UniProtKB/Swiss-Prot annotation:
Prosegment location in residue numbers: 22-74
Role this protein plays: Probable ion channel inhibitor.
Keyword Disulfide bond: yes
Localization (cell): Secreted
Disulfide bonds: 75-90, 82-95
Protein name: U11-theraphotoxin-Hhn1o
GO molecular function: sodium channel inhibitor activity; toxin activity
Source lineage: Eukaryota, Metazoa, Ecdysozoa, Arthropoda, Chelicerata
Length: 113
């Protein structure tokens, strides 16, 4: 009976000591994986930030082009009313008093140069 107890005690001590070693090993392994995960997350975060900055630059570029085009479209064309005191004329147009049509409105219109 004593040999059974000694054998059981020996197996128990070995299991506990090896289990502790595995636990420490697992803890160290998890720390390494966590550190690797952090570096991967930092890399992914930087990559995402670069993509967002590129997208923002494209959107701002499109907005500036759109506003530039819309300004040109507002006064493009002949016969559009304008202000005689406002020097902002579109290229190729000049703000003049109408000769025949529109004289009853008492305003100036864009005409081609």
């Amino acid at each position: 009976m004593n040999t059974v107890r000694v054998t059981f005690l020996l197996v128990f001590v070995l299991a506990v000591s090896l289990g502790q070693a595995d636990k420490d090993e697992n803890r160290m392994e998890m720390q390494e994986k966590t550190e690797q995960g952090k570096s991967y997350l930092d890399f992914a975060e930087n990559l995402l930030l670069q993509k967002l900055e590129e997208l923002e630059a494209k959107l701002l570029e499109e907005d500036s082009e759109e506003s530039r085009n819309s300004r040109q479209k507002r006064c493009i064309g002949e016969g559009v009313p304008c202000d005689e005191n406002d020097p902002r004329c579109c290229s190729g147009l000049v703000c003049l008093k109408p000769t025949l049509h529109g004289i009853w409105y008492k305003s100036y219109y864009y005409y081609k140069k």
